[in-house]
């Protein structure tokens, strides 16, 4: 009886050891709840170091002097931690810029940490236009799963400009690509105005089979009202997906939703460095 108990105990120890080894090897396996935040952030920091060596540190540059000069983000100017697949662990979003032109803005890249390595799950052309001068930004949409998707905008024509949208993110099978059932919305036309007024046009996604964007009517607002609406989007106090700004300075238009700034990039790199 004693020998049988000893054998059972030994088997139990071996099984437990195997389960622990499995969790250590891949913390995404079912039943494993290993907290690898320190290792994850340390690995992400090394990736940021690699990119700052290639493209430079986050900075705000200018193409001239005086009130007419355009400012733009340069170097690794978008660095964001976000749990895109709603698994409780952050992915890393990176984008770099080499100058005041869309042609010089690099791809948006999404990295995850799996089996002790940083893996690039996506590298592609997202809505990498700019706002507030030439600070690159990414547009993010909250999914019903609790995760997030990046919005890809494609522009056609001029006066009016036609935009089409595609959401890309993690699907239920773990692949990164167009979101099933919510991949796109109809095109929308925008005409640029020479008016000096400010305005907003708010968008939300319809529930269900996700085939429709629901635009609100155009609203002219004061700059103070615009700033308040902008703040509510940035801080997540509203469920609005996009906020469009129309101004008279060259008719520039930009989507402003959860804007990633140079300051945020610097702060995120510092946060990752603390774990390294």
Give the ranges of each region predicted by the language model.
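Positively charged n-region of N-terminal signal peptides that target proteins for export
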Residues: 1-9
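Blade-edge motifs of beta-propeller repeat domains
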Residues: 31-73, 117-132, 249, 254-265, ...
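Acidic/hydrophobic-patterned starts of short beta strands in beta-sheet-rich repeat architectures
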Residues: 86-97, 142-152
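Acidic, small-residue rich beta-repeat scaffolds with periodic aromatic anchors
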Residues: 27-40, 145-276
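Beta-propeller blade termini
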Residues: 75-84, 132-149
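Short, solvent-exposed loop/turn segments at conserved positions within beta-propeller repeat blades
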Residues: 101-106, 159-162
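C-terminal motif of bacterial Sec signal peptides marking the signal peptidase cleavage site
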Residues: 19-22
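Beta-propeller blade repeat segments, especially FG-GAP/WD-type strand-to-loop junctions
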Residues: 105-122, 166-172
């Amino acid at each position: 009886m004693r020998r049988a108990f000893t054998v059972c105990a030994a088997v139990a120890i071996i099984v437990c050891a195997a389960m622990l080894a499995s969790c250590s090897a891949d913390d995404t396996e079912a039943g494993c709840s290993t907290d690898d935040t320190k290792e994850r952030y340390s690995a992400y920091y090394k990736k940021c170091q690699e990119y700052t060596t290639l493209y430079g540190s986050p900075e705000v540059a200018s193409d001239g002097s005086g009130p007419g000069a355009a400012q733009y983000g340069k170097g690794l100017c978008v660095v964001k931690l976000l749990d895109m697949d709603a698994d409780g662990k952050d992915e890393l979003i990176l984008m770099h810029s080499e100058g005041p032109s869309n042609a010089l803005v690099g791809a948006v890249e999404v990295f995850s940490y799996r089996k002790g390595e940083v893996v690039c799950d996506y590298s592609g052309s997202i809505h990498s236009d700019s706002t507030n001068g030439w600070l690159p930004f990414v547009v993010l949409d909250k999914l019903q799963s609790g995760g997030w998707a990046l919005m890809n905008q494609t522009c056609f024509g001029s006066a009016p400009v036609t935009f089409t949208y595609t959401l890309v993110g993690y699907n239920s099978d773990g692949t990164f690509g167009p979101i099933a059932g919510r991949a796109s919305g109809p095109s929308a036309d925008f005409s640029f105005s020479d008016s000096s007024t400010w305005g907003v046009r708010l968008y939300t996604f319809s529930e269900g089979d996700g085939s429709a964007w629901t635009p609100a009517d155009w609203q002219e607002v004061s700059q103070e009202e615009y700033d308040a609406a902008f703040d509510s989007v940035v801080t997540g106090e509203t469920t609005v997906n996009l906020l469009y700004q129309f101004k008279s300075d060259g008719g520039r238009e930009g989507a402003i939703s959860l804007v990633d700034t140079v300051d945020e990039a610097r702060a995120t790199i510092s946060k990752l460095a603390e774990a390294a």
